[in-house]
Swiss-Prot record:
Segments forming domain Helicase ATP-binding: 48-213
Subcellular locations according to the entry: Virion
Subunit structure: Monomer. Interacts (via C-terminus) with RAP94 (via N-terminus). Interacts with the cap-specific mRNA (nucleoside-2'-O-)-methyltransferase.
GO molecular function, one term: ATP binding
GO biological process, one term: DNA-templated transcription
Predominant location: virion
E.C. numbers: 3.6.1.15
Protein name, entry field: Nucleoside triphosphatase I
Cellular component aspect of the GO annotation: virion component
Length: 647
């Protein structure tokens, strides 16, 4: 009797046989260039197109792997299965022109029964409600619908309840998407490099979107960072994902250059505030502890970036009054600096950490003044001036304690820049085009692109050598998205091989007595990530790629049947009694079979071949044909090769 996994693989081969005549290339109708799909794009497209009953799929692909191109290829060729399709595409407003309209235009799909819904636009969502009623009233055998959700984690974050007693306004939209996607013969294609960003509850919503009512996933299904009743869950959720990663490493780990993808090097810059900035931080600390928003560390985060004489509290002021106060403070700061610019001689002294003894007293005075307000901005300027190429700088704060004052520092240091934020909506796409041009390959025309959260997803930069993260986001997934703006497939191909790297700089500010909101946020990020990593590993195991590679030569089925059975069979409640007992372990060096360049420290249970890190089972050793664990020697270390704990 075959396992469900084997039967699913036979269905994949049925789909591949059915779609064997689909072209692997697609024509760019603007440039007449022939675009060749990557093997993974072609494989997943054919399986999703060829299996009518595989109605939902998540493209869990790293940034830069071509999710948009693959989606449009699927749209173009679904007519192989059925001639009449209507497409509803959910996206962020900032992704409408690029990549979506541009990709659709290039591939000859613009305007062909396509409706965009901007999930961060209230007017667009109202239009979707009208569209939904029209679709529901007219669903018939003559039309089918493909729903595409780009950055699906954004939709889930807008849906998920903030507490057990509250529901989000977006929930009704979410439920309508689920109903449409699971109407007979319709399909759903979701996309994200980081489908789970904050907690396990997001996985519950993701399952309810892709395969609704099959299980009510709970956080306590993960015990000691191990997924309970893994096989039951695997059989019920099998093949809801396609999984492609540059590396299994997290955002804080160095990665080597691989074909098409730049290497990543992590640097931490610990900087100390001046006594003046430290004093304002302590005032902000007291304010945050009293404030209802203190848990968000709001005021401390602001003054860690820029502290000008006092903290800016809105209090009972109206928004107009508050904006006026902030504007006055900004003008006051500008008046202190005026149009001052450092000389090239002073910039060289600063860049090289040379003594200021030979610098002009007027320049030293200005330098001491601006350093007094922000140790972070000073460090960012030094990183930029020492960079050999173009620089991205992420700063989510747009107004006073953020981009507005940062740009003044850049002007003083004669650093050229463009801005991509909510305040530059009319010009930002043009700015990115200029920044990415070949004649700016090394930043000789425009050195820096400052971008806020508006540019943290969806947009692409080319030939970046340094990223500065000035203010940390709350989630590791957001950091991954930020880094992913610059490390994309072929993003560095115009640079020589030795320049195909990205240095990622985290600037961590502390007061003179060691207080640091940046360190607090780092600790919070890392504490959230363990359970998310368990689910990410699970999604790899149930992916199309894992199953197909295991049973690549399985005989195709004659007709589809398995996915309707799976979708309508509820997974039994997961056994609550799985517990982890104490075990004896030994220190070990290991690496993943997917990337032999990154070596980790762990602890091995010799009885089971399972490796642990921080009491978490994270990998298991691989046996060769002689039943001996695979290993190699590197730098006098015995390094064992491992695979996922769930394989």
């Amino acid at each position: 009797m075959h396992s469900i996994e084997h039967i699913v693989a036979r269905h994949f081969n049925y789909a591949l046989e059915k779609t064997k005549d689909l072209p692997k290339s697609i024509n760019n109708e603007i440039t007449n260039e022939i675009i060749i799909l990557k093997d993974y794009q072609y494989l997943v497209s054919r399986i999703f197109i060829g299996l009518s009953e595989l109605n939902s799929l998540l493209l869990f692909w790293d940034t830069g792997y071509g999710k948009t191109l693959t989606s449009v290829y699927i749209m173009k060729h679904l007519k192989l299965v059925f001639p009449q399709w209507f497409f509803v595409i959910f996206i962020k407003k900032s992704l409408y022109v690029d990549p979506w309209l541009n990709t659709l235009s290039k591939l000859g799909m613009k305007g062909q029964n396509i409706k965009f819904v901007l999930y961060d636009s209230s007017s667009s969502l109202k239009q979707f409600n009208v569209l939904y009623r029209t679709i529901i009233s007219s669903i018939n055998t003559k039309n089918r619908i493909l729903i595409i959700i780009d950055e699906v984690h954004q939709v889930i974050s807008r849906t998920i309840e903030k507490s057990s007693s509250t529901q989000r306004n977006f929930l009704s939209i979410f439920n309508k998407i689920v109903k449409l996607a699971n109407s007979e013969n319709n399909k759903l294609l979701c996309m994200s490099a980081t489908p789970i960003t904050n907690n396990v509850l997001e996985f519950k919503y993701l399952i309810n979107l892709l395969r609704p009512k099959i299980i009510e996933f709970k956080e306590d299904f993960i015990v000691n960072n191990t997924l309970k009743n893994h096989e039951q869950l695997k059989n019920g959720l099998i093949s809801i994902t396609s999984y492609q990663k540059i590396s299994e490493a997290d955002s804080f780990t160095n990665t080597s250059y691989t074909e098409g993808f730049a290497s990543k090097n992590i640097f931490y810059h610990n900087v100390t505030m001046t006594p003046e900035q430290s004093n304002i931080f302590n005032i902000a600390d007291k304010h945050d502890k009293k404030s209802a928003l203190g848990g968000l560390k709001t005021m401390r985060r602001l003054v860690s970036s820029f502290a000008f004489y006092d903290i800016k509290i809105k209090g009972s002021m109206s928004q107009i009054e508050y904006n006026k106060m902030v504007s006055e403070k900004l003008n006051e700061f500008k008046s202190i600096i005026g149009n001052f610019k450092f000389s090239n001689e002073f910039i060289d002294i600063f860049r090289n950490n040379d003594s200021f003894s030979n610098a002009k007293s007027s320049e030293i005075e200005i330098f001491d003044k601006i350093k007094q307000y922000s140790c972070k901005y000073i460090e960012a300027c030094k990183i930029i001036l020492n960079s050999n190429g173009k620089v991205l700088l992420y700063e989510p704060l747009v107004s006073f304690e953020g981009i507005s004052t940062l740009k003044i520092y850049f002007n003083i240091f004669n650093i050229s820049y463009v801005e991509y934020s909510s305040k530059t909506e009319s010009t930002r796409d043009y700015n990115i085009d200029i920044f990415n041009k070949y004649d700016n390959l090394y930043g000789n025309k425009i050195k820096v692109c400052i971008f806020s959260a508006a540019g943290s997803e969806g947009i692409s930069f080319s030939s970046i050598n340094d990223i500065i993260i000035l203010d940390l986001p709350w989630k590791e997934s957001d950091i991954k998205q930020i880094i992913g703006r610059s490390i994309r497939l072929n993003s560095h191909e115009e640079l020589p091989i030795e320049k195909r790297y990205v240095n990622v700089h985290f600037i961590i500010a502390s007061t003179i007595d060691g207080k640091s909101v940046d360190k607090e946020i780092f600790d919070l990020i890392k504490s959230k990530q363990d359970k998310i990593n368990v689910l990410n590993s699970f999604m790899k195991v149930i992916s199309i790629e894992q199953i197909h590679s295991k049973y690549k030569y399985a005989e195709p089925v004659e007709n589809e049947y398995i996915f309707n059975n799976i979708r309508h069979t509820k997974i039994d409640d997961v056994n609550e009694n799985n517990v982890i007992t104490k075990i004896i372990v030994s220190p070990i060096y290991y690496c993943s079979e997917d990337n032999l360049n990154i070596i980790y420290n762990g602890y091995l249970d010799k009885k089971t071949g399972i490796i642990y890190s921080n009491n978490i089972p994270i990998a298991k050793l691989i046996l060769d044909e002689n039943n001996i664990y695979k290993f190699f020697i590197k730098d006098d270390k015995l390094v064992y090769i491992t695979k996922s704990i769930y394989e």
